[in-house]
From Swiss-Prot:
Pathway(s): Glycolipid biosynthesis; glycosylphosphatidylinositol-anchor biosynthesis
Entry function: Mannosyltransferase involved in glycosylphosphatidylinositol-anchor biosynthesis. Transfers the second mannose to the glycosylphosphatidylinositol during GPI precursor assembly.
Its membrane topology: Multi-pass membrane protein
Gene Ontology biological process terms in this record: GPI anchor biosynthetic process
Alphabetized GO MF terms: alpha-1,6-mannosyltransferase activity; glycolipid mannosyltransferase activity; mannosyltransferase activity
Classification via InterPro entries: PIG-V/Gpi18
Keyword Endoplasmic reticulum in annotation: yes
Keyword tags: Endoplasmic reticulum, Glycosyltransferase, GPI-anchor biosynthesis, Membrane, Transferase, Transmembrane, Transmembrane helix
Keyword Membrane set for record: yes
Organism annotation: Aspergillus fumigatus (strain ATCC MYA-4609 / CBS 101355 / FGSC A1100 / Af293) (Neosartorya fumigata)
Compartments where located: Endoplasmic reticulum membrane
Protein name: GPI mannosyltransferase 2
Top-level EC class as recorded in UniProt: transferase
Amino acid sequence: MSRMTVLSPSAGSQSACSLGLILVNPRRPLRSLSILFGLWKALIFLVIVICPGLGYDTSTSLLLYPTRDLSDVDPLHFPLSLRFVRWDSIYFVHAAEHGYVFEQEWAFGYGYTRLLALLASVLVLYRLSVNIFGGDTAKQKTLCFLSAALHIISPAGAFLSAPYGEALFSLLNISGLYLYSSSVLDAATNHRLSRDLKLLAAAVLISAATAVRSNGILGGVLFAYDALLQLPQILSRGLSLAVVSRLAVIVLGGCVIALGMAVPQYIAFNAFCMTSNAPRPWCGWTIPSIYRFVQEKYWNVGFLRYWVVPNIPLFLLAMPILALLLRSAFWAWRLPSVTSKFSENGANGALTKAMWLLPRLAIIQALLAVLAFTSYHVQIINRLSSGYPLWYWYLAAELISDFKNSQSTNKCISISAVAVQAIMIYGLIHAVLFGSFLPPA
């Protein structure tokens, strides 16, 4: 009988486990997250590239052949990069190349078209998670790692790999939240100068995020919340130099965020309303806003305007993420139980202070969900959600809890694991639809 080398099942399992530890190892988060990011992006890229033809909508081809009949153009001659230019990205690319030529282009973030780039906010989210939950214990490290890993497979899918605003918005918004959380930690250790400088830097980043996507203005809730926190001190102790200086920094930060929305509107006002031509209708509004006007006129965006029978499938498509956003916002309010769950071995005061950010972030996320449900094209919540970290933390916490429970109860089915699998499947299916220029956008 000839001798054969047979790989036993146990050996195969050990090899698989070894490979898994290389790819997913919370002890080496930066390397592991970078590998996961590269693999997932490569898969999304491959799916989009192999989609055949020009797509259902051929608008992308106008970027290359604005005056040519497409019937005599071989689809194989189109650059592969154009497969990533779908839906709103056509506006982004055109504005980046030619400037803001048409009125409706002002609906798309002014900041992003001045800096087209593929940016990842995964590593920043990991550092933000460490600020909030700590990174000393195994449970804390796992939570932070899983949160960042979930951001990689965000339901935004192909939009985070295409010339859209979502990737840059996520980077700027999460970076702003990271600096904001760092300022809170500095406040807990009485480093006032560092606290104020980081708070203003956070405002600058959130303002830049607002210039990319208008929903970034919700970040102003953090500063409004901080301002309200000063009222009890003023009422009980009166005005002091420390309170006045703190309030001044907070108000200045809030004004900086508002500039992210106001400056593009001012530029548009000068372009359309301060000329010899007949002014546009919105120029005479009490608060002129080209953004609001073009959203209403060209996309029919407004309160309950999307609530029509043909859009029911889009509401159903958005419901899982809407439910996840609201559920995680409610979870964040349960601060005592959350603190006890992740603050093992006696968390220090600074960590407890940082975790008080969770209710503030819950307000922002809940507002986003309500606005998406009542006033937006509801399906875009699947990509808008990518820049908000709270639901990543919630889902990561549920994964850890479900895994722990499965070990004690031998329960195989985990709702959180099913949710993650559904997000991954949706991301792959959406990549096919995106590459073929098919809805949803």
